[in-house]
Amino acid sequence: MHRTLLLVAALLVTAAGASAADRPTRFWNLTHNTVQEFQLAPAGTAAWGENQCKNDKDGTVDFDERLRITGVESGRYDARIKDMSGRVCFARNINIRAGEVFSVEERDLVDCSR
């Protein structure tokens, strides 16, 4: 009986991990503006990746919209965000976990310029 319970518990843990890996990682835009460029780089670097907004059918991410993120593993990242007004800001040290949703709020934005 004890072995059966351990086996069931192990299967549940494995299934939960597999389902998280099957879900897309997504960015939730909680800034005040529509985002037209969203790039990620490993925290503390300027090795910016592709514009993730290309993953959206209209190429932008409205307030309270979620964007599918591709080509990014779990870890800490900096984000470069350009909104429709032309403002470019950064969000630093974002914790991203594969298969989960992460958000950036207006208060997270620093070093903004036009």
Residue ranges and their predicted role:
Residues K82-C112:
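Structured interaction patches on ligand/partner-binding surfaces of diverse proteins
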Residues T4-T14:
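Sec-dependent N-terminal signal peptides
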Residues A21-T25, E65:
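Structural beta-strand segments of beta-rich domains
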Residues A16-A20:
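Sec/Tat signal peptide C-region and signal peptidase I cleavage site
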Residues R26-T34, P42:
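Asparagine-centered strand-capping/turn motif at beta-strand->loop junctions
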Residues W48-E73:
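Intrinsically disordered, low-complexity Pro/Gly/Ser/Thr-rich segments with frequent PxxP/GP/PP motifs
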Residues Y77-A79:
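A short tyrosine-centered beta-strand micro-motif
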